[in-house]
């Protein structure tokens, strides 16, 4: 355990577009003597969206800014948020724990994929959409592999392009949202020209791919791994042989750290004011943890929070005028890509809901709440700590997961001892 806390004027958790925009903006507008410390699990900045050094012009502009001399970066994981001060308990890859303190703390913890379990979803070869994209970017060979993408949300399209670029055989791109919902979404796109042009760019590349709407996965099957997927549009069903099925129902905000910090949560996202300030003093939340709205919104929030942390309050308020427009886009995405009821109705008694602990739907269904299910079945007690099964249990049974408790990642007993020793020294 490192004895002295690591101190910086601004402490940022996360390293995606929102975090990068906040760090770079702070570094440019704060006094040169003030330092910004960015903490992230990944070895490089960019988050999932800018993984592996995106060549996108917008991404390059912000990523280049991370080389400013008053921005420092540490790789590792945040184990806990300090209750009284803007700070966290941090563990480096070598296992060393340390207190990191800032005058202000910014949480930019992003979002994760939402899964709705279906028969066969735990078979090898069935992956999350973002998971498949990440694996392709880090070397998975899908050349000549038959790929079905079926789920919901804008993430489907960059994933499909990743499969195309990797020479995979993209058989199907199926969206579960209804035609009526998608028509309403399209009607609102002119208010977001940057998103409209992005969508047109994907459609120009994907127009040859079969892309039904109002279509979803009923089940997946195979001997030992995925061999086929059964699709339906509610009127008829059909099977397709494939090697990979990438699926997921839009994204959900990562709010565990914010909840642990005592921030107000509203509609399953962190509640913030116009400058990104949470209900807790000197603690900001930006990006997808405040609502899933894409990189442009995340960057806009990061700029506003970075200016506020740098003491440029007037300029920060001026920049925040753009945010209500993006808040409406978040609401539009949520309304369009929410899971249809049929996805919840098709689950069977033997369908696994908690894959860490191998718990089927039939064992969870009689339980009255998350805590009872946890005590009786070990729901949410595996390595993911409810990150996958928690949202599924909420959708299926209306369970509200327990208040999160540190640590947020599996730890050795020694690391756990060091974490609490660090907290006690700082309290």
Could you say what each language-model-derived stretch is?
Residues 66-90, 100, 166-256, 264-266:
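A Rossmann-like FAD-binding core segment of flavoenzymes
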Residues 286-324:
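A conserved FAD-binding loop/helix module that cradles the flavin
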Residues 395, 402-426:
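Low-complexity, small/polar and acidic-rich linker and loop segments
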